[in-house]
C-alpha cells in the first residue's frame, strides 16, 4: 500500500476510534485468536450432532417451529435444564401463559432458579427480553411463542378489527435492537414459533411461520420439529417419535436431521439415543437382542439397556463423550461450574 493510502487509512481509523471507542474496528491479522464457539446442549445427543457444533450456539438467535404438540416447548425446556446444569442462568418469557412448572421440573429444570415472565403485550415481552439480554447476567432466554406476541393496539382494539402487519413490524423492530446486544453479551435467545397455512398456494409448501420474515433472517439456526409416530406398549401410548430438521444453520452445514423419542413425563430419551447412535458408531455392540459395551454384556433388548444406562450414569457419560469426540462436536462450555450431579438425568 502506498504511503498516501496508509496515511489516509490511519487517519480514518483514528477518527473511527475517537468517535466510537477503541475496538470499533480492528484488523484481523491473526492476533485475534479464534475462540471455540460456545454452545448449550439441546438435551438430545442426535440433535447436538446434527447441529454440527454440539448444541445451540451462544450469542445467536434460534427459532424452533412446528405443528401443535410436536415437542417445541419440551425441546426448549431440555435445553434450559442443560444450561442450568452447567451453572447458567435462564429466563422464560411465557407469552402463551401456559408454563407448567411441574412438567418443567420432571425434565430436569431447576424451577426455583428460573426467571419467569408472563407479559400482557408483545411490546412488553420483547422489552423484557431486551432488558434481560442487555444486563449480561442471563445465559439463555426462551420466548414462547412468537404467535402469542400480540401488539398492544390489537389487545386494546375490538374483536374483528383489522391490524395488518402489526406483529411483523413489531418483530422486525425488536430484532434490530436485540441482535447486537445478543452478540455482545453472548446470550442464547430461542424463539418458539407456530405454523400457519398460506391460502391459495398451488406449488411448494403452503406452510409458513408467524411474525413476518424478520425472524427467518436474523436466526442463525432454524429447527423444524415434527411428531412422526407414537411409542406404544400394548395399547398404552408412552410418548412420541420425533424428527427435527435443521432448516438453517450459519455455524455448520444445514439440512441435517435427528430422530429421537420424547417420553411422556420424562422428556427426550437420552439413553435411547445413546443406544441407537452408539450402535451406529460401533461404540456399543449389538448381537441379536443383546447389547455389549467394552466386551461386557449390558442388557437384552433396548428397554433393559435403557434402564441399565440410567442406573449407570458414569458409563452413559463415557459413551456420550466418545460419540461426541468421534463426530468432532465436543462441547465448549466456559460459563459456570458443573456440580456433582451434572452427568445425571432427572429421575422419572
UniProtKB/Swiss-Prot annotation:
SUPFAM superfamilies the record matches: P-loop containing nucleoside triphosphate hydrolases, RecA protein, C-terminal domain
Pfam name, any one: RecA_C
Ordered alphabetically, the record's keywords are: ATP-binding, Cytoplasm, DNA damage, DNA recombination, DNA repair, DNA-binding, Nucleotide-binding, SOS response
Tell me, in one coarse class, where this protein mainly resides. cytoplasm
User: Which terms in the Gene Ontology molecular function aspect does this entry carry?
Assistant: ATP binding; ATP hydrolysis activity; ATP-dependent DNA damage sensor activity; damaged DNA binding; single-stranded DNA binding
One GO BP annotation is: SOS response
Q: Which GO terms describe its cellular component?
A: cytosol
Instruction: Provide the protein's localization.
Output: Cytoplasm
- Paired cysteines (S-S): none
Q: Which residues bind ATP?
A: 66-73
What is the role of the protein in this entry? Answer: Can catalyze the hydrolysis of ATP in the presence of single-stranded DNA, the ATP-dependent uptake of single-stranded DNA by duplex DNA, and the ATP-dependent hybridization of homologous single-stranded DNAs. It interacts with LexA causing its activation and leading to its autocatalytic cleavage.
- What family is reported? Belongs to the RecA family.
Query: Which PANTHER family does the entry link to?
Result: MITOCHONDRIAL DNA REPAIR PROTEIN RECA HOMOLOG-RELATED (PTHR45900:SF1), RECA (PTHR45900)
User: Which protein, by its recorded name, is this?
Assistant: Protein RecA
